[in-house]
Amino acid sequence: AENLKVTHYRNGDAIPTGYSNEAWSNLDDTTTGAYAVYNDNESYADTYGYLYNWYAVDDERGIAPEGWHIASDEEWMELEMALGMSESEANSTGYRGTDQGSQLAGNTDLWYNGDLENNSAFGTSGFNGLPGGYRSSSGNYYDVSYTSYFWSSTVYSVTFAWNRVLDYNYSDVFRNNYYPKSYGFSLRCVRD
């Protein structure tokens, strides 16, 4: 399993990219879908895929390949529960579960050493979550080697959407709805 690396919507239209920090931060005003390469360095994309704002996830042209869709918040919870998280924990926010974050992570060479990697369940699910970091609404890049940020397809409000975070120093999974849609996160697809 790997993070999404598409540069076009399903209909063939190019997904905009190459935005300066200021231009990236202005995408919130137009709700324009876009993607970025961590630190504008294409070699990162080979390993971590691209970082997409949530507007690209929500675009009616479809960002997932034919026969696939971006995982919803509910599908993330189903996955977490299949890995042993209780339903009540899955429905809560913040860090939840026990070792589900470690199960979802993969590739010890890429992660900064911490509780995520040191847990015996590390990498056992096949999900292979990699620490690709994120692009903030200001356009700056953060946390490669330390975190995996994933958008779900589930909206929370005009400004926010549901997401997941794997962090090098936690073996559980972070769920929240307070990152702005303008942030650039990794994406995972589920077969229709």
PLM features per residue range, with description:
Residues 1-192:
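Conserved positions within compact, well-structured domain cores
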